[in-house]
Amino acid sequence: MESRDHNNPQEGPTSSSGRRAAVEDNHLLIKAVQNEDVDLVQQLLEGGANVNFQEEEGGWTPLHNAVQMSREDIVELLLRHGADPVLRKKNGATPFILAAIAGSVKLLKLFLSKGADVNECDFYGFTAFMEAAVYGKVKALKFLYKRGANVNLRRKTKEDQERLRKGGATALMDAAEKGHVEVLKILLDEMGADVNACDNMGRNALIHALLSSDDSDVEAITHLLLDHGADVNVRGERGKTPLILAVEKKHLGLVQRLLEQEHIEINDTDSDGKTALLLAVELKLKKIAELLCKRGASTDCGDLVMTARRNYDHSLVKVLLSHGAKEDFHPPAEDWKPQSSHWGAALKDLHRIYRPMIGKLKFFIDEKYKIADTSEGGIYLGFYEKQEVAVKTFCEGSPRAQREVSCLQSSRENSHLVTFYGSESHRGHLFVCVTLCEQTLEACLDVHRGEDVENEEDEFARNVLSSIFKAVQELHLSCGYTHQDLQPQNILIDSKKAAHLADFDKSIKWAGDPQEVKRDLEDLGRLVLYVVKKGSISFEDLKAQSNEEVVQLSPDEETKDLIHRLFHPGEHVRDCLSDLLGHPFFWTWESRYRTLRNVGNESDIKTRKSESEILRLLQPGPSEHSKSFDKWTTKINECVMKKMNKFYEKRGNFYQNTVGDLLKFIRNLGEHIDEEKHKKMKLKIGDPSLYFQKTFPDLVIYVYTKLQNTEYRKHFPQTHSPNKPQCDGAGGASGLASPGC
């Protein structure tokens, strides 16, 4: 809403002295409001002072000041003279929000009648309801609740602040931190406040209460929150739990009450690897340390005895020794070196600090050790039986967890899937431990983008996609699953640049529905283009495009044909990848060139036996589109063509514009180009494999398509893995493509 200023100066020239007088009157108006001088306010308004004037520093108007003073009469006077009831201060606060801070129900009613929104907020996300909780204004809080205020609204802050994990607090957290016991009771008992709502840093109201510098009501507030089911294992800044914060407050009563909670994790550590017991020893808190020891705190969490000795606390030393603390505590070796370079620093830190073991697993749910977010928690660094692993967290018993573990257990022998090391359960969560890789495919392509050099092969794309194809092939044939979520974030690259398939929480045990396999193949087709394009087209954009549009975006014939075959796999969809691993896309340029030479070396081609099977197969069909090699003799370097035709000069049997003669030409040139007498010819052509790839970009695919299901495929390079999994369905052992593949 625009500011409504009913006291604008009359149009026309004004003297500088007049302007100065007007500005002075504006400042005097604010001063008069602050001094609660109603008569002077009236006089200045009638004299032309700007009722919506905002002072420079905070953007306060006369109305804001009147609301702050709870002067309802001055507020009404200003409104009658055109004060804007929704004008914001520089921090975004409106008169309505300030009325909640002042605790004036009458002013809150007034501004609601003037168009205020009960849930409007300032630029930092504070609503009137939150401010009433912050300042302990019970009547205002109850009034706003009745008028529809959102009790559990989380503070929405600026985007840059949100990236720093600031904001997200609720009115309950504010009341807990400020020590307003009555407000807290009302919020919990009458208004249904969520006791375990968390701010953007993951802190609940219990953490906020323990962060308060005022300890007078902290015990009462803590008891109240615990009685309403507050989570005692939540973490605040630097990973501190309520128990650790209570120890830092040196508050024996709080520690006692927290230890009475059924699910308290007594050995949890903060981000520095310190437990509540270690902190109690460092802070020389004998009674708290003794209480923790009696409640079962691990004494294997640091050099407790030496710390107590350095503090000259002999009685604490005796307590610690009586509970099993070691005199000769040996921390992890300082010279330990991680295998992972990307995660090395965090792994060294995790290796160094104390963490209570969960079965065979050591890990820490903390931002410092987080690899990625997931729908059920996240993926973290960890050690499983001292092996570096990625730990994927699930809610125990969730369908996603069951699918992930079931699929991983069936794939233990497959090298192109992440290795499954084991899992552990704890506090209603399942922790699944798999191969720790360096980065996702998406992150890897960010590094490789722009590396393409003209006239050079893309070995990276070929190798990565070969690994991905083998992984999906293993998943389909050996494991009997379909993935259902193939995307760049689920392809991981290890320290040796090998690709591994991961994230099986959407995978399905294949029961014969070809559509499930086709879904994987279509995603693979998009992954092919994504990798070839080095991620320059986002996978989300590729998913939004039709299959035909994706095919047309292909940069070369091999890529185009491979994607087309993935989109149209034919009847035997489950066998498709077995054959596509032998597709020309995966051949080196030298292999493509060698294949053309080998086919051209067939005797029926060399002798132009026109009725032969191979020349019949290579003959273009009547409905086929034109090819780059239709008039191939005109596209070869003129000098080279003359030189090669010279051999047939006596018989007049020159090369003709047929596929067979082109293959014979490639064979003959390959046999002789390295001879000394053909040195000049090689200078003109350069590398023959590159020359023919560029001159006839569709030739290899043409030959492959014509000969793939014939005996002449013997000339194709053998790229299949010797341990290729066998299909347990029909046709899997033949090694031949299905009609559609």
Curated annotation (Swiss-Prot):
Induction: By interferons. Virus replication in higher vertebrates is restrained by IFNs that cause cells to transcribe genes encoding antiviral proteins, such as 2'-5' oligoadenylate synthetases (OASs). oligoadenylate synthetase is stimulated by dsRNA to produce 5'-phosphorylated, 2'-5'-linked oligoadenylates (2-5A), whose function is to activate RNASEL.
GO biological process, one term: defense response to virus
Swiss-Prot/TrEMBL keywords: Acetylation, ANK repeat, Antiviral defense, ATP-binding, Cytoplasm, Endonuclease, Hydrolase, Metal-binding, Mitochondrion, Nuclease, Nucleotide-binding, Repeat, RNA-binding, Zinc, Zinc-finger
A GO cellular-component term linked to this record: nuclear matrix
CDD domains recorded: RNase_RNase-L
Keyword Mitochondrion belongs to the record: yes
Protein name, per record: 2-5A-dependent ribonuclease
PANTHER family: 2-5A-DEPENDENT RIBONUCLEASE
Localization of this protein: Cytoplasm; Mitochondrion
Gene, per the UniProt record: RNASEL
Compositionally biased residues, Polar residues: 9-18
Pfam families: Ank_2, Ank_5, Pkinase, Ribonuc_2-5A
Annotated region (2-5A binding (P-loop) 2), positions in chain: 253-275
ZnF region ranges: C6-type: 395-444
Reported tissue expression: Highly expressed in spleen and thymus followed by prostate, testis, uterus, small intestine, colon and peripheral blood leukocytes.
Entry's family note: Belongs to the protein kinase superfamily.
Medical condition linked: Prostate cancer, hereditary, 1: A condition associated with familial predisposition to cancer of the prostate. Most prostate cancers are adenocarcinomas that develop in the acini of the prostatic ducts. Other rare histopathologic types of prostate cancer that occur in approximately 5% of patients include small cell carcinoma, mucinous carcinoma, prostatic ductal carcinoma, transitional cell carcinoma, squamous cell carcinoma, basal cell carcinoma, adenoid cystic carcinoma (basaloid), signet-ring cell carcinoma and neuroendocrine carcinoma.
ANK repeat residues: 24-53, 58-87, 91-120, 124-153, 167-197, 201-234, 238-268, 272-301, 303-329
Effect of D541E: No change in enzymatic activity
